[in-house]
Amino acid sequence: MNSILERIAKHKLEEVAVAKKNKPLHVLSKQQPGEIRDFITALKSNTSPAVIAEIKKASPSKGLIRKDFNVAEIAKIYTQNGARCLSVLTDIEFFQGHPDYLALAKSKTTLPVLRKDFIIDSYQIYESLVLGADCILLIVALLDDVQLMDFCQLAQELKMSVLVESHTQDELERALRLPTPLIGINNRSLHNFKTDIQLSIQLKQFVPKDKIIITESGINTREDIKLMQSHGINAFLIGESLMRADNIGKALQKLMTD
């Protein structure tokens, strides 16, 4: 049986082919991007946990996560309650996201915004810029080394930051070859969706000190954050635990303060 990641990649190729027909690259690239915000500096400033708060309606492994899903309202709440950056799921088929959600969230916040999607074609990088992304996600498991370098350099030429995500030591080594300081360690396997937050602690030893480690998936409690901070990890991408909360603002504050 194909892994979830393989199914997503196959569908994404079809999706991008349709997008290119509907709006060819020469048309897309003429659209004027808006203001680009500094994602990297936002994660560096001060000593409190640097939370990238995620706007996510559903996932392939968990199904519907938040029924009452108002992108504009969630973006405002995250902004008012101490998030450093936002992450917005734009995948339609598997995560019930939408590219329009990114543009909407960006219009409701002063924070930098990450486009969380499965990038397999340079077209999506130009699209991300037009939608208002300040940072894109590149997933090592999805791309070869040439694609990773080309996509990373293209995004940076367009003035966006790049978060490169790995799940294994081998993937991490490939990620570290790229000219970006943002190193994501996904504690959840994109092949079987099993989660283990110890993975970030295990892989941290291989990451140079000039990089910013972002631990992703499975960070659900204040104790999880304190554990990571005790091992020198201070940036967190958090979605599901916030999206499941009745009071999103309080849930975010609770993660960040004793």
From Swiss-Prot:
Intrachain disulfide bonds: none
Coiled-coil blocks: none
Enzyme Commission no: 4.1.1.48
Pathway: Amino-acid biosynthesis; L-tryptophan biosynthesis; L-tryptophan from chorismate: step 4/5
Biological processes annotated in GO: L-tryptophan biosynthetic process
Keywords: Amino-acid biosynthesis, Aromatic amino acid biosynthesis, Decarboxylase, Lyase, Tryptophan biosynthesis
Domain of life of the native organism: Bacteria
Gene Ontology molecular function terms on file: indole-3-glycerol-phosphate synthase activity; phosphoribosylanthranilate isomerase activity
Classification via InterPro entries: Aldolase_TIM (IPR013785), Indole-3-glycerol_P_synth (IPR045186), Indole-3-glycerol_P_synth_dom (IPR013798), Indole-3-GlycerolPSynthase_CS (IPR001468), RibuloseP-bd_barrel (IPR011060)
Reaction(s) catalysed (UniProt annotation): 1-(2-carboxyphenylamino)-1-deoxy-D-ribulose 5-phosphate + H(+) = (1S,2R)-1-C-(indol-3-yl)glycerol 3-phosphate + CO2 + H2O
UniProt keyword Lyase present: yes
Recorded family membership: Belongs to the TrpC family.
The protein's name in its UniProt record: Indole-3-glycerol phosphate synthase
Gene responsible for this protein: trpC
